[in-house]
Swiss-Prot record:
Recorded superkingdom: Eukaryota
Gene that this sequence comes from: ndhJ
Name of this chain's protein: NAD(P)H-quinone oxidoreductase subunit J, chloroplastic
Chief subcellular location: plastid
Organism: Cycas taitungensis (Prince sago)
InterPro entries: NADH_DH_suC, NADH_quin_OxRdtase_su_C/D-like, NADH_UbQ_OxRdtase_30kDa_su, NADH_UbQ_OxRdtase_CS
GO biological process: photosynthesis, light reaction
Keyword Chloroplast: yes
Amino acid sequence: MLNTYTDTPTRKTNEVQGRLSAWLAKHKLAHRPLGSDYQGIETLQIKSEDRASVAVALYVYGFNYLRSQCAYDVAPGGSLASVYHLTNIQDDADQPEEICIKVFVPRKNPRIPSIFWIWKSADFQERESYDMLGILHESHPRLKRILMPESWIGWPLRKDYITPNFYEIQDAH
């Protein structure tokens, strides 16, 4: 059996492949299952270069709502992560199906294809992850700072960020 993420043989250990992971594997879309979170939501890791094709496939599958997109710095000097929470919303669903997608990118050249063209709600969320962490969402139509001034230097939410000209504010007691 081949791992669809690395094209290497997998071991038959306690690796959990959920329903969506099996569906993506059936359609030969590269990914790596990361198990489920505390709510039972399946989590998958996708390579940056596979992000666009997997996003289109998930939209076709029925994930019509981008609940959130966020990003974080994994470790000082390490990689950056972009996280997507997608929901399959239907009129008669009491418990809509959800999935979490994680994309890890190198800190030196953090590029991910934009999903704005699939889910318009990604607009401000991708701009925020660019503004705070410097992740470039390729083909985003308005990728510019959204929270910080355009003249701001650096990426404030990176763990190795040093605040320029920072002065500690003293309490006035």
